[in-house]
Amino acid sequence: MNRRDLLRSCAAGIPLTIVSGARAPQMYWAGTPQRIVEAMLDLARVTAGDVVYDLGSGDGRIPIIAAQKYGARGVGVEIQPQLVRRSRQTARDGAVDDRVTFVEGDLFKADISAATVVTLWLNDRMNARLEPKLKTELKPGSRVVSHQFRIGQWVPAQTSHVDDVDLFLWVVPEHAG
């Protein structure tokens, strides 16, 4: 990937893994705007009974807003330790640390079986890699919302367009895995 494409991807907020001769990949992150976060959670029809998992949770704003605005429980999975620390502090500052947990780890290895809602802002390739995990680990009726990117060949149940951003909703069917 050339420098211009990298900068364009980062400016667009696309989390991007770059392997450039280093042993560990570099992860880039940009936060989802509040209006988009709320639109994603509204699209998933989040309620106080939900457990919202955000895969690649960055600064934790999606699980935190899910707890603050909707009364849901939230779990953020993030590989960057400094973002996990920041998320935990923000949850404490927002008085939702009793309902929100942040896990430092690889989203492909995380146990997501307790989720009723999963949110994503990854990219096409990562979403496609996640598709089998989502379909096998999530219970039927669980909702998945992606900011900007589709999930493989999985057909969305609903789409929304907010501030020039496409949002996609999928509902896990019976016998998905």
Name what the model sees in each region:
Residues 1-17:
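N-terminal secretory signal peptides and thylakoid transit peptides that target proteins
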Residues 60:
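Glycine-rich SAM-binding Motif I of class I
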Residues 73-78:
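Conserved SAM-binding motif I beta-strand of class I
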Residues 32-48:
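Conserved alpha-helix/loop element of class I SAM-dependent methyltransferases that forms part
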Residues 49-56:
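Conserved class I S-adenosyl-L-methionine
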Residues 88-110:
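S-adenosyl-L-methionine
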Residues 126-177:
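C-terminal substrate-binding/active-site "lid" region of AdoMet-derived donor-dependent transferases
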